[in-house]
């Protein structure tokens, strides 16, 4: 018999005596289980399938529906291979619970909180259920402050809020995961902050790359694992929909403990929140619910709200969440990204057009927004610089049709100057990443906010009009651009 990893043996044996059901139907990852009259488990309770003839099984399920006639419908958190009708099922009497606290740092977990990194069991008895209420209104902290990332385009145009929710929007292959990896790297090095990474329905290869990158950069300390700065929770593409639907909650539960009990500021990375919605859609169809717009589940807003409302700042500490959002067919009006938009403080939109030009990070400076870009929060200097950068880029965008038809020579002198500066700004928004050193051959750069503002002010003022635009491509601060220009001239 397999014991739920978050329930001790004595508790299981006590439950075993009073609440045992049997599988009556299996449809893929969905099980129907019959229980004795009056002993129905609650919604979200964890059920453990008991193997026949003392054979161990590895299947934990979560109750999703009460069907009547003493039957429940549950969704499996792992493959249901080998399960048969008539197998006994134990009601654990509680939701899935996962280990929390400092012992989780430097480790990789699955949706059930079991370590999957071959480094032995987790040294903690402290567990927490993955289903909880959001903090009460009175507990929330409403202070506004900027979260510096060291990435120029992000810090200048859609600045991130400490304790806020940020969405990285983009189609396939524009650099969402790479940007998340760079943010984890920069934040661990510059701020020494703790991070929890939730890999929700993404490529296993990317999860492996992230783990190896963490070890190389020292975010995961191989010599002394408890000194690590990140906990990783994976429910990747090959997992059943139940695991992909709940792995985000597992990561969030670990982050909540650091916030509420350790009173720390913690970062929660979710890659990819669209896969959370997609898994919910699969589960909804398997449970027989009528689909809503574009085939999504009718409970889309509720499911998204129950996750997002728990990601917040309280008087004890904060959770700053950065979520990659895959945009199907680059359509921002799709219900999944559109529902996510409502919860975010900042949106960083990644553009395929910029990626095609080789400008990385491919953050669209005009589409990306932030509620923090206000003079009373970021200061007049930052606000004015950001607005002038946007105006210059917007004017360049308006002129592109004329340039394509008539050429640059037909523009006025003022417009030609605007185009030249906009092209320099566009290239200066690119930046070499630490986590992409292997691909680019350029060492990564962390650029402070003051340096970023100074650089763009110099371009806008016209002081650097004489420098070639390629000098601004893939550099850190403005001094590197001027040095690169000198090298290009010689």
UniProtKB/Swiss-Prot annotation:
Lineage, opening ranks: Eukaryota, Viridiplantae, Streptophyta, Embryophyta, Tracheophyta
Membrane topology of this protein: Peripheral membrane protein
Subcellular location: Plastid, Chloroplast thylakoid membrane
Family membership: Belongs to the ATPase alpha/beta chains family.
Catalytic activity as recorded in UniProt: ATP + H2O + 4 H(+)(in) = ADP + phosphate + 5 H(+)(out)
PROSITE patterns for the chain: ATPASE_ALPHA_BETA
GO biological process, one term: proton motive force-driven mitochondrial ATP synthesis
Protein name per Swiss-Prot or TrEMBL: ATP synthase subunit beta, chloroplastic
GO cellular component, one term: proton-transporting ATP synthase complex
Subunit structure and binding partners: F-type ATPases have 2 components, CF(1) - the catalytic core - and CF(0) - the membrane proton channel. CF(1) has five subunits: alpha(3), beta(3), gamma(1), delta(1), epsilon(1). CF(0) has four main subunits: a(1), b(1), b'(1) and c(9-12).
Source species of the chain: Ipomoea coccinea (Scarlet morning-glory)
Keyword annotations of the record: ATP synthesis, ATP-binding, CF(1), Chloroplast, Hydrogen ion transport, Ion transport, Membrane, Nucleotide-binding, Plastid, Thylakoid, Translocase, Transport
One GO MF term: ATP hydrolysis activity
Paired cysteines (S-S): none
EC nos: 7.1.2.2
HAMAP family xrefs: ATP_synth_beta_bact
Amino acids binding ATP: 170-177
Keyword Nucleus belongs to the record: no
Task performed by this protein: Produces ATP from ADP in the presence of a proton gradient across the membrane. The catalytic sites are hosted primarily by the beta subunits.
Any matching Pfam family: ATP-synt_ab
Record-linked InterPro entries: AAA+_ATPase, ATP-synt_VA_C, ATP_synth_F1_bsu, ATPase_a/bsu_AS, ATPase_alpha/beta_chains, ATPase_F1/V1/A1_a/bsu_N, ATPase_F1/V1/A1_a/bsu_N_sf, ATPase_F1/V1/A1_a/bsu_nucl-bd
Record's keyword annotation contains Nucleotide-binding: yes
UniProt xrefs under Gene3D superfamilies: 2.40.10.170, Bovine Mitochondrial F1-atpase, Atp Synthase Beta Chain, Chain D, domain 3, P-loop containing nucleotide triphosphate hydrolases
